[in-house]
Amino acid sequence: MRGLGKGSSAITVVNAFATGKGGAIGIDLWTEAKVKITDGEVKGKILVNGLEFNDFRVVNAVLDVMRRYSGIEFGIEFEINSEIPVGKGLKSSSAVANALVEAIARALRLNIPGIKVVKLGVEAAKKAGVTLTGAFDDACASYFGGLCLTDNLRVELLKRIEIDELPVVILVPNETVLTEELKGVDFLKIAPYVEEAFKLAIKGEWKKALVLNGLIYSTFLSYPPEPISKALHLGAVVGLSGKGPSVFAITDEPERIEEVWREFGDVIITSTR
């Protein structure tokens, strides 16, 4: 029995670290998982932009969660191909979890509603230790697309807003920041300000929300201000994705942003979905 699943990257509108409530927008960068059900053996590979990635925590956690959910003891042969950079704030873990849960569900012929696929993926991400809040906002945006606003503590989708297909430029610095590295940071210090950003997002003013969120978190986490500053000067809507270090810009002139960001790291041009 075989199955195929997909999950996309996403960009942050409001980071849930400070308040437990967050929002993200799906973008057109993908992770694909192919699985074959076996009698018990677990083997496979993860490729990120063609390079082998040897952290299998999310895979093992998804397998545990799906065994328990289905009541079936099984193994898998898997191949995961991703075009989402890891440790850059671009929801790579959410995309892998969604893709793998969906692939296993299809292989086992389980009819699971989309929101349950997402919740199983979030459970696995928590189990794997790759999220501080459960990242339900990221997981919803990865699975459903559009803007998803959530209460991550209650695992509740509060609002989903369709987003037009808009050009997105992503700056991917060389630095990698893993979520587990932030466990000692007291994000409550910025909670009152992040709460205001979330209120804007719920009202539909998500562009204002993501700029405010980006300024708050990038300053609090001491990221260099130049990339955001340069993009704001060009009239772009600019934010920090997740915990960073990736910065993104929504703009009608992606080539201009790409030009000024090249000195800071790799640049990807994609779109919202």
UniProtKB/Swiss-Prot annotation:
Official protein name in the record: Shikimate kinase
Protein EC: 2.7.1.71
Family: Belongs to the GHMP kinase family. Archaeal shikimate kinase subfamily.
Species of the source: Pyrococcus furiosus (strain ATCC 43587 / DSM 3638 / JCM 8422 / Vc1)
Lineage: Archaea, Methanobacteriati, Methanobacteriota, Thermococci, Thermococcales
Catalytically driven reaction(s): shikimate + ATP = 3-phosphoshikimate + ADP + H(+)
Entry GO terms, CC: cytoplasm
Alphabetical UniProt keywords: Amino-acid biosynthesis, Aromatic amino acid biosynthesis, ATP-binding, Cytoplasm, Kinase, Nucleotide-binding, Transferase
Molecular-function GO terms, alphabetical: ATP binding; shikimate kinase activity
Residue sites binding ATP per the record: P85, V86, G87, K88, G89, L90, K91, S92, S93, S94, A95
Pathway: Metabolic intermediate biosynthesis; chorismate biosynthesis; chorismate from D-erythrose 4-phosphate and phosphoenolpyruvate: step 5/7
UniProt cross-references to InterPro entries, sorted A to Z: GHMP_kinase_C_dom, GHMP_kinase_C_sf, GHMP_kinase_N_dom, Ribosomal_Su5_D2-typ_SF, Ribsml_uS5_D2-typ_fold_subgr, SK_arc
Subcellular location: Cytoplasm
NCBIfam families: Shik_kin_archae
PANTHER family, sorted: HOMOSERINE/4-DIPHOSPHOCYTIDYL-2-C-METHYL-D-ERYTHRITOL KINASE, SHIKIMATE KINASE
Keyword Kinase appears in the UniProt entry: yes
Location (main, coarse): cytoplasm
GO biological process: amino acid biosynthetic process; aromatic amino acid family biosynthetic process; chorismate biosynthetic process
